Amino acid sequence: LVGSEMCIRDSYNISLDEIQRRVLEAISRGANEVCLQGGIHPKFDENTYIDIVKSIREVSDTIHIHAFSPLEISHGANCANTDVKSYLLKLKEAGLNSLPGTAAEILDDNVREIICPDKINTNEWLNVIKAAHSIGLHTTSTMMFGHVENYYDIAKHMHELKSLQLESNGITEFVPLPYVASEAPMYLRGLSRSGPSFRESVLVHSISRIYFNESIKNIQGSWVKMGYAGLSYLLDSGINDVGGILMNETITRSAGARHGQELDLIYIKNIVESKNMKLIERNTKYDLLKEPTKANFDKLKLKLKDIN
């Protein structure tokens, strides 16, 4: 498996039948997006990712498929002995709608050599995102912080993302991800910090709001990483998005986080309204849908919008 020093080593595979079952369950509960990503399995090839997308399309023509990190895309293209753009076109033809901008960690190769030496480098990550945008596939963007990086590395990471966005305008949101260390191999071997302080996490969200301004308009707070109490602070610090409700989150919980299985919408609605804000459902591309009610509280994507 190709991975990073921030990931635990236990791995598993999910069959196409199980993927279809989970998709159908999500649809039955009102989901409008399915998100898939994973590690690099030594037996996966270029057809694996295409078959996953096709299997979802067999059970739904309409659900938005948000899948495969730049690392997975790069792996698929290499297996196919083709360029990234050509491989992305095959995935798009199969039914892929957008990509998660994960596996970014910190976009500096000196840092990446420490935390994820087996992953793609900075330029390779950026090139996958650019290629996706060039064929009409939007992406998210992320940054994992609080491990071995310094403030300069954080600034450089944000600069790389902003420069890319000003060129291609395909990033829908920026998601700062505080490093969850408790079960991460790198931390257990004493090679990283124990994660950012709460104050650091809040400041990174605030700075990202100021720096990205109109270039990346949506700043998402990860309730999976920060919890409900943390989300309350982030709402005062520049975020306008609380992300997805989720049904089966495993990455953060496997690293030791206590949150991530499913969002309590009643509780989060009270937090949002206490900030004089309004909870509004959105889709993956940030089209606003409707205010959540008891009848649609199982919807997956939410958007925060200031009343004023």
Give the location of each predicted region.
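Short, small-residue-biased leader/transition segments that mark boundaries at the very start
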Residues: 1-8
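Conserved sugar-transfer catalytic core signal across GT-A, GT-B, and GT-C glycosyltransferases
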Residues: 2, 128, 230
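Helix C-cap/helix->beta junction micro-motif
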Residues: 2, 59-63, 135, 168, ...
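Short connector loops/turns at beta-strand edges and beta->alpha or beta->beta junctions
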Residues: 4, 104-107, 179-180, 247
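Generic signal for short, ordered secondary-structure residues
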Residues: 5, 35, 70, 111, ...
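Conserved Radical SAM active-site core
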Residues: 9-156, 160-163
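Auxiliary Fe-S-binding modules of radical SAM enzymes
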Residues: 21, 27, 159, 165-308
